């Protein structure tokens, strides 16, 4: 008997006593005895294997009267081989196949090919349990995510997915129907983009295995424009086009420009063809870098609740600086607009809610943190700051306070018992309209008077709220089922100088998420800068 077989044998039994007991007890009895004897489910081994899905194993085997699921008459079922292949394929889900006992599955399959194990019921019982443990662990990680979202310090506050499946029942059905592979794929998130991203990860693994070692990192020194000559162009051309014997290798020509523009678009940069520090950084991304990035974003999709695909919903991707109003599982886009999100130290949180009303010509009651942290110092330096910005000081009972009557030299963040409110109008920091989805973060979507900021590549300038580039158009789309609010009425309300709140007939799900990589239905990749430095934390949890 090959030595590897003994990885499945508990160490404190001798081989002879194992065989003697196994002849007396059937496989089902051995499975029951193993599960009864250890609530921790530790499998003695060269290194210990934990039955982390112990509760599900109990449910699965008790319903089938502890009968084996993966072996028959001493041989492995064809579905055992399918499961092993699915575990290998979990690499392209951004997971680690060894976490699902790939090595043990390979050893078992190899040894079954060498000799039958039908005389050893205890050994067959452990084989069965390992395959079931592998299936259930992979299934739960694909469905819920491998890393608990609350344990990762990435400000992810989206409501956790409600578990709607009974994993043990799905396994039972898959075993009976010889559909293990199909059932595993059924645990993928419902978002169609998941399968697209998964294929991109497969491509990057192929690139990583075929790439030349020690690819030099490009070093930025100065801007390179079309027609410039630069030694760096030689390496850039080699990466994007390949060698060209009849080409001036140091000249930035139109052929290379086309490829540079593709890179800039893929990374969400301004496609101007100018090779600057951001473009150099994009060109320095290796397949290994991309593998980690993609794995992180697959995990984020596994965290998302399925409820947002049931109807129309609003999605804001912070890292992409874009809002999309979509339907049909995100495949049909009804509206899109650039957005501005929170600065790194006032980052926009990742959460979900329901948009319930719109406010035209809004006032702005300045959050106390901004009043204390930013406004009081500005007012002290410039007494006209409040009047220039159309702001008033109010008591919490609503009485207006004359700023000239306050002794500003003695005012501090600790002794300012007032609120500051900005009147409606084009000067208002919220612009001419705000879209409210009540949440504990006091974050909402709104217009802004600072339109020039939308021309920037990196648009992280706000205090956490989401500033919208095309607010009037968005209001039209949101209110299209309300006959009282046509384009003219919306324009009038936005410029009336008086607050008007409009309740939506049906609340719209809103998801504020953070994706730094995704792939569209055409296989085109989109890569975005990790502006809040959140990817590394998740990658560490996934792979370490």
Range-by-range predicted roles:
Residues 7-15:
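Bacterial N-terminal signal peptides
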Residues 21-64, 129, 136-137, 156, ...:
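Well-ordered beta-sheet/strand-loop patches within structured domains
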Residues 22-163:
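Cationic-aromatic interfacial patches
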């Amino acid at each position: 008997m090959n030595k590897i077989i003994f990885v499945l044998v508990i160490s404190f039994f001798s081989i002879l006593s194992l065989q003697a007991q196994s002849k007396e007890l059937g496989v089902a009895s051995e499975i029951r005895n193993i599960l009864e004897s250890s609530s921790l489910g530790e499998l003695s081994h060269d290194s210990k294997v934990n039955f982390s899905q112990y509760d599900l194993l109990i449910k699965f085997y008790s319903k089938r009267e502890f009968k084996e699921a993966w072996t028959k008459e001493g041989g492995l079922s064809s579905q055992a081989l399918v499961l092993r292949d699915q575990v290998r394929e979990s690499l392209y889900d951004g997971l680690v196949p060894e976490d699902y006992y790939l090595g043990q599955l390979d050893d078992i399959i190899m040894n079954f090919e060498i000799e039958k194990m039908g005389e050893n019921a205890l050994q067959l019982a452990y084989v069965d349990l390992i395959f079931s443990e592998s299936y259930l662990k992979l299934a739960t990680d694909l469905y819920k995510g491998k890393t608990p979202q609350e344990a990762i310090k990435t400000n992810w506050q989206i409501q956790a997915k409600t578990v709607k499946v009974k994993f043990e029942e799905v396994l039972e059905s898959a075993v009976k129907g010889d559909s293990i592979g199909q059932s595993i794929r059924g645990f993928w998130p419902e978002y169609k983009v998941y399968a697209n991203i998964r294929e991109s990860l497969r491509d990057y693994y192929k690139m990583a295995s075929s790439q030349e070692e020690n690819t030099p990192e490009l070093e930025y020194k100065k801007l390179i424009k079309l027609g410039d000559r630069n030694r760096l162009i030689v390496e850039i051309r080699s990466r994007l086009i390949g060698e060209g014997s009849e080409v001036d290798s140091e000249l930035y020509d139109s052929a290379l420009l086309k490829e540079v523009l593709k890179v800039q678009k893929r990374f969400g940069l301004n496609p101007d063809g100018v090779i600057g520090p951001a473009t150099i950084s994009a060109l320095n991304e290796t397949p290994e870098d991309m593998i980690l990035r993609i794995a992180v974003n697959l995990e984020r999709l596994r965290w998302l609740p399925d409820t947002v695909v049931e109807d129309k919903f609003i999605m804001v991707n912070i890292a992409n600086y874009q809002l999309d109003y979509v339907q049909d599982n995100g495949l049909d886009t009804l509206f899109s607009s650039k957005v501005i999100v929170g600065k790194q130290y006032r980052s926009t949180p990742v959460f979900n809610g329901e948009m319930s009303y719109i406010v035209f010509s809004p006032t702005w009651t300045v959050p106390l943190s901004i009043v204390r942290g930013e406004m009081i110092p500005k007012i002290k330096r410039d007494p006209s700051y409040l009047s220039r910005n159309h702001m008033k000081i109010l008591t919490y009972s609503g009485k207006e306070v004359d700023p000239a009557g306050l002794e500003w030299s003695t005012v501090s963040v600790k002794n300012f018992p007032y609120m500051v409110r900005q009147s409606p109008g084009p000067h208002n920091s919220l612009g001419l309209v705000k879209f409210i989805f009540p949440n504990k973060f006091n974050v909402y979507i709104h217009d802004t008077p600072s339109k020039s900021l939308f021309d920037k590549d990196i648009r992280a300038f706000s205090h956490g709220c989401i500033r919208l580039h095309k607010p009037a158009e968005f209001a039209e789309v949101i209110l299209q089922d309300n006959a009282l609010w046509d384009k003219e009425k919306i324009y009038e309300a936005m410029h009336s100088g008086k607050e008007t709140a409009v309740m939506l007939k049906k609340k719209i799900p809103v998801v504020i998420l953070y994706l730094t990589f995704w792939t569209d239905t055409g296989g085109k990749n989109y890569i975005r800068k990790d502006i809040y430095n959140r990817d590394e934390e998740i990658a560490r949890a996934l792979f370490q």
